[in-house]
Amino acid sequence: MAEIISFMALPFDFVDGAIAAGEPVKCQSPAAAVERAQTLWKVFGHAGSVAFSRTSDLEIGKFGEKHVLRLFGHVTDEYR
């Protein structure tokens, strides 16, 4: 199986004084991931969100590095 690129939007919330990631949302394109991340932050009131892409080869269980497309609000240092 060849490598595939996944586009994700990931919300963040303040939990016990720290920032915690929520459930990622899979998107169809980079633009859709950015739009969804912005919506999670602005409309749904999360502390922040990030749109990112990542390559993966599920057959061998290999996941590539995350590539941040856009940040909104407060996110963990992992995405900065």
Q: What are the residue ranges of the model-derived segments?
A:
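Generic detection of intrinsically disordered/low-complexity segments and helix-coil linkers/edges
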Residues: 1, 6-8, 35, 46, ...
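Intrinsically disordered, low-complexity boundary segments flanking structured domains
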Residues: 11-12, 37-39, 58
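Short, mixed-charge low-complexity intrinsically disordered segments
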Residues: 41-80
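Short aromatic-glycine-(Arg/Gly/Cys) micro-motifs in beta-strand/loop hairpins
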Residues: 1-21
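A short, charged, amphipathic alpha-helix used as a generic interaction element across diverse proteins
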Residues: 27-48
